[in-house]
């Protein structure tokens, strides 16, 4: 295994303790008003970013966007981890009516306002438009204290924001209340408009921030979990296919369901990545040599190398060139 990946997994490993309450299930240990969270020995910071028009872009623009995305990933610091999250959540009708609809003003234009509001409500009640999508990028790093973590985030957050802006994606940092609101909506589906949190007031009264976001109950079964009366399930991709369409993520997140899709990224130094690919290529060549030796021992001197071995050999050589 790659050394950096092995060290990261080792640092993330924690001793499991049986939770005594629903609050104990939430892994966050401490929060700060600026949005820095501590979980275990790691600190994290989250950015919210807007979507880009990739699906309708031309082939040249898609290539440019893909290369810009690659530059963003390559700019991430080794030793840190990054999580890209796409959050599909149900649109809260009461909140929509309060924030989006135009209130009547008692003049001659109220008829137009009423008609416009009816059109918006008709759009929202349609099942295909009842789910809104938000996107986040979360940076996490192991540091000795929050001051060192803030120094790291000051640099990396600015770099990530500038690269996202270069892709025409608006980006904003999220404070503690914003991040807790996301967790509240996840843990308390159907109660999105009931989120109330004042960090200063909580500290004054000695209340835990977890009380504001945790569900009433949480149960974990063999293949699903029950959270506040709602049933859920976690799926993960154990292995990737050799070819993945660029529309795969869009197809997964276009489901009309409340879901969170996360992509975890662990940056690896170039020299370690090249060494790993060279070892894999050496393994492929060894398999080919052993196969040919077996064929020769059977007096089969004209045998063609199996297609899967030849394909592995062809894919490994260009991969080393792209990494280096």
Model-based region annotation:
Residues 1-324:
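Extended, folded cores of ATP/NTP-driven motor/assembly subunits in large transport
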């Amino acid at each position: 295994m790659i050394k950096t990946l092995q060290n990261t997994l080792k640092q993330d490993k924690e001793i499991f303790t049986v939770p005594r309450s629903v609050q104990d299930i939430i892994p966050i240990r401490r929060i700060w008003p600026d949005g820095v969270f501590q979980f275990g020995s790691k600190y994290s910071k989250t950015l919210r970013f807007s979507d880009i028009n990739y699906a309708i872009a031309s082939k040249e623009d898609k290539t440019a966007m893909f290369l810009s995305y690659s530059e963003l990933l390559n700019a991430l610091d080794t030793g840190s981890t990054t999580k890209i999250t796409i959050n599909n959540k149900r649109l809260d009708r009461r909140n929509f009516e309060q924030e989006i609809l135009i209130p009547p003003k008692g003049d001659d234009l109220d008829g137009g306002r009423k008609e416009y509001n009816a059109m918006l409500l008709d759009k929202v009640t349609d099942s295909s438009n009842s789910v809104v999508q938000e996107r986040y990028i979360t940076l996490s790093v192991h540091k000795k204290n929050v001051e060192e973590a803030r120094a790291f985030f000051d640099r990396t957050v600015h770099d990530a924001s500038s690269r996202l802006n270069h892709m025409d994606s608006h980006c904003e940092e999220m404070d503690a209340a914003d991040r807790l609101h996301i967790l509240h909506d996840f843990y308390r589906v159907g109660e999105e408009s009931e989120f109330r949190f004042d960090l200063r007031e909580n500290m004054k009264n000695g209340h835990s921030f977890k009380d504001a976001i945790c569900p009433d109950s949480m149960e974990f079964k063999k293949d699903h979990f029950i959270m506040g009366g709602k049933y859920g399930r976690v799926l993960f991709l154990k292995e990737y296919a050799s070819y993945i369409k660029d529309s795969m993520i869009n197809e997964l997140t276009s489901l009309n369901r409340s879901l969170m899709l996360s992509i975890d990224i662990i940056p690896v130094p170039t020299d370690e990545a090249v060494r790993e690919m060279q070892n894999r290529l050496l393994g492929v060549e060894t398999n080919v040599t052993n196969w040919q030796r077996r064929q020769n021992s059977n007096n089969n001197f004209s045998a063609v190398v199996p297609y899967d071995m030849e394909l592995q050999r062809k894919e490994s050589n260009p991969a080393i060139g792209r990494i280096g």
